[in-house]
Amino acid sequence: VSSIPSTTPKTPSRKLGIPLVLTAGIFWSSGGLIYRLIDEATPWQVLFYRSGALWLMLCLWLVIRYRLKTKQIFFWAGLPAVIGGLCLAVAFTGFILALEFTAVANALFILAAAPFFTALLGRTFLGEQITRLTWACMMVAAAGLAVMTGGELALGRGLGELFALMAALGFSGLAVSLRTRQGTDMLPAIFFGSLFAVLFAAVGIALSDSGLIVTPIDLAYSSSMGLFQVGVGFLLFTVGARHLLAVELTLLSLTEIIAGPILVWIVIGEVPSLGAFAGGFLILGAIVTMALLGASTPAARSRPVS
């Protein structure tokens, strides 16, 4: 999410931006825990109500924020927002399915590698250059992924890790699609993403013959994932991101990856495997290294990104 382009504010305030982005990461980190608390609903039902709640929230927010200019915002966002939304729907779907088939820590650590997939897609489709530092960090992250997925595959598992990779690629596709039109507001892309995810979920529900009826508590949990875990987290991030540098956003957003497994560990006792710890350490180390050393350029130091 930290690649969202927007207008830089005239008077950025780090004292405001830091707590907002940290809080956004905490909201995002709650997804794994909430999913584990769901009792009977299938992954497709969770995806349906999670994405539906987010879509309804965005409809309301777009009308409040843009009023009569809402149509113009969608027109200006154009095809990149639609393609980005499709990628985001793939990411939403992959994330929920990953939580169903693997540990929360595994899913989140693999999602943390999304910036490296973004770099590869940016090079392939936009001709963006990849620095030697980024290549080196990508190799370290790839080693981390191999440690995590290799251990699971050796045990005859690994489906959840593949879904997490799908989610990471989806988020990367969103970032690259938005780069094709600098300054694009991310709201239309998330609008389309949540709508497409509802459609994906509807197909999954139809094929699995699970229906739309869930228990009230599962409905509450699923909807809260859309309203609070994604929705409120995104709104906090977009406000806070206007006041921070790209490197700060990258590092502060890691609260999601760190807090997510800890929450599940403390509340329900889901302990990550040794392979997940080792692989996650390599991935997080690569991200921190790239963020800190990559911030040595004047542009990275001086320009807040949102």
Task: Describe each model-derived feature in a short phrase.
Residues I18-V21, F75-I83, Q129-A141, G160-A164, ...:
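Cytoplasmic-side transmembrane-helix entry/capping segments in multi-pass membrane proteins
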Residues S13-G17, E40-F48, Q72-G78, L145, ...:
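Juxtamembrane helix-entry segments on the extracytoplasmic side of multipass membrane proteins
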Residues S2-F48, L86, G94, A143, ...:
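Glycine-/small-residue-enriched transmembrane alpha-helix faces in small-molecule transporters
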Residues L60-L62, L97, A114-A136, A146, ...:
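C-terminal transmembrane-helix exit sites in multi-pass transporters
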Residues S51, G150, D218, L254-S306:
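C-terminal-most transmembrane helix of multi-pass membrane proteins
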Residues S2, E40-V90, F117-T118, G170-L174, ...:
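Transmembrane alpha-helices of multi-pass small-molecule transport proteins
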Residues L58, L62, L88, I130-G150, ...:
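Hydrophobic transmembrane alpha-helices of multi-pass small-molecule transport proteins
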Residues T23-S30, I34, W61, V82-L97, ...:
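Hydrophobic alpha-helical transmembrane segments of multi-pass membrane transport proteins
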